[in-house]
Amino acid sequence: MFCSLVQSVSRGLHTTATALQASAAPTTPAAAAAAAASMSGATQRAGSIAVKKGMTAIWDPWGVRVPVTLLQLDSVYVTQVKTPETDGYYGVQVGAGLAKPHRAGKSVVAHCAKADAPPLKEFAEFKVTPDALLPAGHQLTAAHYQVGQFIDVRGVTVGKGFQGVMKRWGFKGQPATHGVSVTHRSLGSTGQCQDPGRVFKGKKMAGHMGAKYRTTLNLQIVKIDHDNNVLYVKGGVPGHDNAFITIRDAVKQYNKTSGPVPTADKAKTGAELLEKQGSDPYLRYESA
């Protein structure tokens, strides 16, 4: 009897807690997503697609010469907006690179025309929070980012073809003399003896090098050319020249600098340079 009484009380408490959670929960998916975003306090903006135009070097505010990669936002348009009502989540699809209508597929032309955008070559999708949604047909420019902001870039690395273990993995190789012949650049032993009697999966060997998607994190924007929609990013970016690069706000940000939400209100002109903030990062020793 005592056990049945305890079970009935626990069932009643569970029912009451469930009812309270249901009454406090948002009634629509949109409200639930907005509530989650407000609770986390984090806004996830849409990214963009850029074209890698090459590398050069500039001088930062402290007079240090730094290598930079030029990324141009070439005709970047929002081609589709996804919501929980239609797709189950919030997302923004963007396209970049003008394509010739007679070379683009009919489905691509129709998809872009639905968003009042010209036929495009490359497409990418980004999950966003409700406060960062963008209308279909909106064009993204370099003003979507700001100087000093950190970004993550993703692209296909330059293909190197079939390479040996010394170039592909940095192996030491075999001795040059002392009885070694022909196999100076070979990998050497690949396993053990009868036990386990096989080569483990993932063993580093010679093979195709490069031509893989890679993401580089936390690259800083040190200059923005608004007239040409070019971002000057500190450091190297994976991919060859004229390759499409996917850009997003840095996931692991070193500082709180971020772009406007959901994007810039109006286009800008001229160029913006990184300004001095705080102490000299290159200062190591101070004279008395």
Task: Kindly give the residue locations of the regions a language model identified.
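Extended basic (Lys/Arg/His-rich) segments that typically form rRNA-contacting surfaces
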Residues: 2-288
